[in-house]
Amino acid sequence: MLKQLRPALVMIVSLTVITGLLYPLGMTGIAQVIFPANANGSLIEKDGTIIGSELIGQGFTGDRYFHGRPSAAGQNGYDAASSGGSNLGPTNPKLIERIKADATALSQDEGSARPPIDLVTTSASGLDPHISPETAFYQVPRVAKARGIDEAALREIVEQQVEARELGFLGEPVVNVLKLNLVLDRTSTK
């Protein structure tokens, strides 16, 4: 019996050390050397203080800022510890009511009849940092008015912040809301 148990225990300990310790430490070390910013969460600093990550959405309020997608992560949204969608199906009355209410409020706030889908639907993670370029352009009149910026100049800033498809063919062009708002803060002083 001991003759059969020993190889099993050696295998368990060996694989635990290899897959639970050596492999993760090796990959972390390689990532730190090759992609240090990415390996540490793609953090964004302002005046020496970490204010967010390129990879995790944040809630922005007020007319001076572009708004991201709504978040279902956590009680008040944008809670990275509670990442996840609302789990409401497309025919769920609560989801339909929320989308209609959000669409109505956005139509009144933005002065436009129909808001883009990005502004009324959550992402699967609830923490999507990106919106479509169309969604950013939809918000230009409100942000331009609040900041006292010419709409054409603001559209140009948005154009500069559009990130192309990954590898030229994966996904759709997107705008990172945090990075766009930081560019606005640097260029606008009103």
Curated annotation (Swiss-Prot):
Pfam families referenced in this protein's UniProt entry, alphabetically: KdpC (PF02669)
Membrane topology: Single-pass membrane protein
Oxidoreductase is among the record's keywords: no
Keyword ATP-binding: yes
Predominant location category: membrane
Keyword entries, A-Z: ATP-binding, Cell inner membrane, Cell membrane, Ion transport, Membrane, Nucleotide-binding, Potassium, Potassium transport, Transmembrane, Transmembrane helix, Transport
Signal peptide (residue range): none
Gene Ontology cellular-component terms listed: plasma membrane
Membrane spanning stretches: 10-30
Location within or outside the cell: Cell inner membrane
Molecular functions per Gene Ontology: ATP binding; P-type potassium transmembrane transporter activity
Subunit structure, as described in the record: The system is composed of three essential subunits: KdpA, KdpB and KdpC.
Known role: Part of the high-affinity ATP-driven potassium transport (or Kdp) system, which catalyzes the hydrolysis of ATP coupled with the electrogenic transport of potassium into the cytoplasm. This subunit acts as a catalytic chaperone that increases the ATP-binding affinity of the ATP-hydrolyzing subunit KdpB by the formation of a transient KdpB/KdpC/ATP ternary complex.
Family: Belongs to the KdpC family.
Identification of the protein by name: Potassium-transporting ATPase KdpC subunit
Name of the gene: kdpC
